[in-house]
Amino acid sequence: MNRQQLEGRIDIAPRTPGVYLMKDAAGKILYVGKAKNLKSRTRAYFSGTDSRAMIPFLVSRIHDIEFILTETEKEALILENNLIKEHHPRYNICFRDDKAYFNIRADLNEPFPRFQLVRRPRKDGAKYFGPYPSSASARETLQFLQSIFPLRTCRDAELKSRTRPCLEYQIKRCLAPCVGRINSEDYLQMVRDGVSFLEGRGNNLLRELRERMKMAAEQMNYEEAAFLRDRIRAIEETLERQRMVSMTFKDQDIFGLYREGHLIQVCILLIRQGKILGSRLLPLLKFEGETADMLSSLLMQYYDQSVDIPQEILIPASIEDRQVIREWLEEKRGKGLSILIPRKGRGLELLHIAEQNAEHGFKMERKSLDDSDESLRLLMERLHLRRFPRKIEAFDISNIGGRLAVAAMVTFQDGRPLKSGYRRFRIRTVHGADDYAMMYEALKRRYQGKENLPDLIVVDGGKGQLAVAFSLLKDLSISGQDVIGLAKERVNGVTVQGGVNKSEDRVYLPHKKEALYLSRWPAVLFLLQRIRDEAHRFAVSYHRSLKTRSDFMSLLDDIPGVGEVRKKALLLSFGDLARIREATVEELTQVEGIGKDLGEKIHAFLHNDQRSVEPSTG
């Protein structure tokens, strides 16, 4: 479609809200935008009235425009966000965070709730707190909660089946609701106290605890008063360590940006009840447009993934869609909020803190990327690769004598793990211990569609596995693809010509008889070893999980009266065979479908059976 045809399509575009998709000659989406008035918005791209720096580059590539009409501007905003996440257009900002940050979860609808760490919040009616800036901070918070609010940490199955208190009760880290040592009302009060602390209402909680301590002392319940006193002291010490930055006691997210060219680092300062809880550095973003456009899309994508939306969001620049985004966030949050651009005072000071953190994060990230680029450049040079190995995919096989065979693929982008690119394969067509055939199957299943090919394929193994990979690429008519084999150390203490120890990892290249040793280039060797080891870890963990489940199922197959339904019920309740061995008859009979007679049979069988139930070590 030429320029005249494009302008003709725009002339008949509706003057209603909606989304427009700009595509190149191959039909690939270059840019997704939203508009209150589709006709006037898209016309600006070709009339010269849109002064954004990216517009000439974008317009020169547009061959088609597609329109999707919506009822309201807010619907257009939501649809735009969904399309960007689905298609990742080049000229849109695309926030993709492969980290799964920890949240703390508590379901207050349960009779005896517990606090637990989860990675992905769900819409299940529970309360979620987070995400925490690091796993260490999340675990530290959970440990603190458990030290001053002695709630259960056990799974639901253990809570229902236990007949005597566990060790946690003995060391005063749990009040044993499993055996009725605390009633539901008192237990829930302690959970609510923990929730108050997580919500940042520590001062309110302290006032309430002091009142309850005073009342307990007046009633001569000195044990309860002492218990409350210790909790008060622990909370006071924690609150003293938190820096008060605002006397308004508000919950705020403050977005600081640092930009060099197309690269943008974002730091979010997390403030709850006027105190800095921490900061969160987002992955380095690449965006060719204006900062204001980036901010709109970033707010949509960031809060679309979050369950923790504060009452104030501070941003460094004005955005066109602020009102619509605010309405969308209020709907998600269930109450009002503000999106502000601070011009003076404490808000501006906090924004500067966030921006300084963003700049520091950018420089650290840039140095890391520069180091990775140097390692990748050396890798390309030493191995004579055709392309710069920005995207690398590595494969490993795991099995025991051909049993429960699996393959794993890991992806590294710019020298770093890209978890969204990991894949696991349960080997389907190979019977017996044939690692070569297993590798062929895994490679075929990954590359037969010829989509999103990497710059480099790494297979774990020597000449044989490399030959398999090379053969597979030939069978699929994939040419020009770099592939190498990385063999683990085999022989110790044997020196070959040139003084190279043969115990070193060896790299095998197509059409080369001799292996290449990389000890002279430690950065390259370390990178390849890290990739190989991650593929091995991923494969072994998958195989181990399958083996544990298989051992569990096969052992229970020998018990009369235990079929598939009861096996699954036992697995769901106890998790693994070792826990079932530890269970009493009474605990076994708590599982649905298992009465006293069958529980006794299972208990007797497991304690007479001598087969190992230890998990595979790979």
Curated annotation (Swiss-Prot):
SUPFAM superfamilies: C-terminal UvrC-binding domain of UvrB, GIY-YIG endonuclease, RuvA domain 2-like. The keyword DNA damage applies. One of its GO terms (molecular function) is excinuclease ABC activity. The UvrABC repair system catalyzes the recognition and processing of DNA lesions. UvrC both incises the 5' and 3' sides of the lesion. The N-terminal half is responsible for the 3' incision and the C-terminal half is responsible for the 5' incision. Interacts with UvrB in an incision complex. PANTHER family: UVRABC SYSTEM PROTEIN C (PTHR30562:SF1), UVRC/OXIDOREDUCTASE (PTHR30562). Belongs to the UvrC family. This is UvrABC system protein C.
